């Protein structure tokens, strides 16, 4: 079942066709990657796959909120057949763990890890939530304010509710907020050499 689950993810190639107007705001080098409609009369159509490389760039750059919403929903609800598989995998893992004398599959897997028990992990998550909530709230407020200012400056988006930050809005306005602060990911990456970063991650997760 796990093989079927993973194979469906690898083979998944669904997506959406958008006209160029719907993709207004997309960088040309990103737009050039998208497949074009074969029929001559439809050459203004581009195909955005539900995979991360395509969906993230549409969510991050497309000015049209309807475009971002369609991309978000399509990507979020891809592979519906995997839902039942995942439920069955979780069910069987739990049953196997119980047969081995563990309370759950999580308890079985954690026995050889640094975090020995589910209770330890839960406590850690709660501490992280408390520590990060204020910062996360402030960042969300900043993104919401960026949406308001953007809508005020762009009168063609009059149908948008400036007081609502939808899930498909976050990447777009977060990008604008970072650009306002002149955050360049390429410059940030200079502080994280590949070899050192990979070794640190492996040590953390081992």
Task: State what each model feature region is.
Residues 3-51, 59-60, 87, 92, ...:
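Active-site-proximal, well-structured secondary-structure segments within enzyme catalytic domains
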Residues 67-68, 72-82, 86-89:
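Catalytic nucleotidyl-transfer cores of nucleotide-processing enzymes
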Residues 58-74, 112:
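Short, charge-rich amphipathic alpha-helices with coiled-coil/heptad character
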């Amino acid at each position: 079942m796990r093989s079927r689950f993973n194979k469906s993810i690898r083979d998944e190639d669904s997506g959406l066709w958008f006209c160029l107007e719907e993709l207004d705001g997309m960088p040309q080098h990103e737009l050039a990657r998208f497949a074009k409609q074969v029929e001559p009369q439809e050459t203004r159509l581009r195909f955005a796959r539900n995979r991360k490389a395509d969906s993230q760039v549409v969510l991050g750059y497309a000015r049209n909120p309807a475009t971002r919403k369609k991309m978000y929903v399509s990507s979020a609800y891809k592979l519906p057949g995997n839902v039942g598989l995942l439920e069955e995998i979780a069910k069987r893992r739990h049953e196997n763990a119980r047969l081995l004398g563990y309370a759950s599959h999580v308890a079985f897997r954690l026995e050889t890890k640094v975090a020995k028990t589910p209770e330890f992990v839960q406590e850690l998550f709660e501490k992280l939530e408390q520590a990060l909530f204020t910062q996360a709230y402030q960042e969300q407020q900043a993104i919401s304010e960026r949406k308001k200012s953007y809508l005020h400056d762009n009168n063609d988006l009059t149908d948008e509710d400036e007081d609502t930050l939808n899930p498909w809005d976050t990447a777009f306005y977060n990008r604008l907020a970072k650009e306002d602060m002149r955050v360049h990911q390429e410059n940030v990456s200079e502080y994280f050499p590949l070899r050192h970063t990979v070794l640190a991650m492996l040590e953390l997760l081992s």
